[in-house]
From Swiss-Prot:
The keyword Translocase does not apply. Belongs to the lyase 1 family. Argininosuccinate lyase subfamily. Transmembrane segments: none annotated. This is Argininosuccinate lyase. It comes from the Bacteria. Pathway: Amino-acid biosynthesis; L-arginine biosynthesis; L-arginine from L-ornithine and carbamoyl phosphate: step 3/3. The keyword Cell wall biogenesis/degradation does not apply. Keywords: Amino-acid biosynthesis, Arginine biosynthesis, Cytoplasm, Lyase. InterPro entries: Arg_succ_lyase_C, Argininosuccinate_lyase, Fumarase/histidase_N, Fumarate_lyase_CS, Fumarate_lyase_fam, Fumarate_lyase_N, L-Aspartase-like. The gene is argH. It is an enzyme of class 4 (lyase). Its main location: cytoplasm.
Length: 468
């Protein structure tokens, strides 16, 4: 009988038989959590330096650990690291390799910590970096929309409610509506980043540690705002992952709405835009097809992000304090959401500013649905007609024009006057599309002057955020 651990696993002292081979495969996570290796190594280096400061490690042991971890990072980056599912996860794979490289000092690294606080720290570090990358792409998309909005500040298109022509708007105004969605998304992601930037390291398994650790030191080295305040909560909390996924689900919802409009606009029935060939695909059977696959995929991938949010919520809803192995299942949906969101933003940041707006088609569509009917009602109100009466009068005029196959602006003055004697020659000034959009010249309105003012504000804001 020997007390020497001959297994690859680093926790077998209490066990009398080897882990079942299927259970090893079933419970291993190294095939997906290995992408945390940089964060895991950074956390271990900070932990080793802190242990040396408080006298748990010698300076020589600290240096050997840091050097060994540096070598392991290089091995992983160069594809030379041998991952083993028998070691379960990224943490044990790295620790085992460290011990193989430097000997006994490697076995001391885990003093004063657990995989519970270790993985919680790793995920926060990883997600913090992922959010930064996502925000970069989000800002790039915002900037592209703002530039296109300026180009299309005077372009008139139909605005829709219930997918029916409602009132004329400018294309630039519509693009700035997308921009406003993304500004809110940015704020949610930034708030999420602030809340996740607290360090669990040092909370150990669930109760803390009896070693004289200095959590403020590791917190500072790893760039966290502060250490967490309760060890039980720290190792079991996945709020930050859920919050990120909720924010991501909203971003994807907005991108999906944009995608739906792009798909409609690119169809021959609308013809509002032409997408560059590089963002489209063809058909294996129909030679004429130019399919907006990028937009369709963004719309489709929204479903998986929504599904990931639900998976995380359901994962956490029944767990008692503190850490449970269920939490291993947090990483794949989290990784997938971050990857999917960043890819979708990259695709749209490249594609949407490259849309070629078909201005004449937009204008024709705006004229086709009596889009200036509200302007005629407003005209009557300014002439002293109560709004409800004006609404009724214009409704009858629209029905007449529809039966005649003409727009309101194409009716003769005497035809309009049969519906209200208050109508005079000046009515035609308000029945043009140009007059309609120009009249909405107030903060938030669709007038070209307002679009340009909002573009200037947005450009100043983005210049500060992007350093350009």
């Amino acid at each position: 009988m020997t007390d020497k651990n001959t297994s690859e696993q680093l926790w077998t002292g209490r066990f009398t038989e080897a882990t079942d081979a299927f259970v090893e495969q079933f419970s291993a996570s190294e095939h997906f959590d290995r992408r945390l290796y940089r964060q895991d190594i950074a956390g271990s280096m900070a932990h080793a330096r802190m242990l040396a400061e408080v006298g748990v490690l010698t300076a020589e042991e600290r240096d050997r650990i840091v050097d060994g971890l540096t070598r392991i990072r290089e091995e992983i980056e160069h594809g030379q690291f041998q991952w083993s599912p028998k070691l379960e996860d990224v943490h044990m794979n790295i620790e085992k390799r460290l011990t193989d490289l430097i000997g006994e000092a490697g076995k001391k690294l885990h003093t004063g910590r657990s995989r519970n606080d270790q993985v919680a720290t790793d995920i926060r570090l990883w997600l913090r970096e992922a959010i930064d990358g996502i925000l970069d792409e989000l800002l790039r998309l915002q900037a592209g929309l703002v530039e296109l909005a300026e180009l299309e500040a005077d372009t008139i298109m139909p605005g829709f409610t219930h997918m029916q022509v409602a009132q004329p708007v400018t294309f630039g105004h519509h693009l700035l509506a997308w921009y406003e969605m993304l500004v809110r998304d940015q704020g949610r992601l930034e708030d999420c980043r602030k809340r996740l930037n607290q360090m669990p390291l040092g909370c150990a398994a669930l109760a803390g540690t009896s070693f004289p650790i200095d959590r403020e030191q590791t917190c500072s080295e790893l760039g966290f705002d502060r250490p967490t305040r309760n060890s039980l909560d720290s190792v079991s909390d996945r709020d930050f992952a859920i919050e990120f996924n909720a924010a991501a689900a909203l971003v994807m919802t907005h991108l999906s709405r944009m995608a739906e409009e792009v798909i409609l606009w690119a169809s021959p029935h609308f013809g509002f835009i032409d997408l560059p060939d590089r963002f489209c695909t063809g058909s294996s059977i129909m030679p004429q097809k130019k399919n907006p696959d990028v937009a369709e995929l963004v719309r489709g991938k929204t479903a998986r992000v929504h599904g990931n949010l639900n998976a995380l919520l359901v994962l956490m809803k029944g767990q008692p304090l503190a850490y449970n192995r269920d939490n291993q299942e947090d990483k794949e949906p989290l990784f997938d959401t971050a990857d999917t969101l960043r890819d979708a933003l990259t695709a749209f940041a490249d594609m949407l500013p490259a849309m070629e707006v078909q201005r004449e088609a937009c204008y024709r569509a705006a004229r086709a649905g009596f889009a200036t009917a509200t302007d005629l009602a407003d005209y009557l109100v300014r002439k002293g007609v109560p709004f409800r009466d004006a609404h009724e009068i214009v409704g009858r005029a629209v029905r007449y024009a529809s039966d005649e196959g003409r727009d309101l602006s194409e009716l003769e003055l005497d035809e309009l006057q049969q519906f209200s004697g208050t109508i005079s020659e000046d009515v035609f000034e308000v029945l043009t599309l140009e007059g309609s959009v120009a009249a909405r010249n107030h903060l938030g309105g669709t007038a070209p002057a307002q679009v340009r003012a909002r573009v200037a504000e947005a450009r100043d804001r983005l210049r500060l955020l992007m350093g350009k």
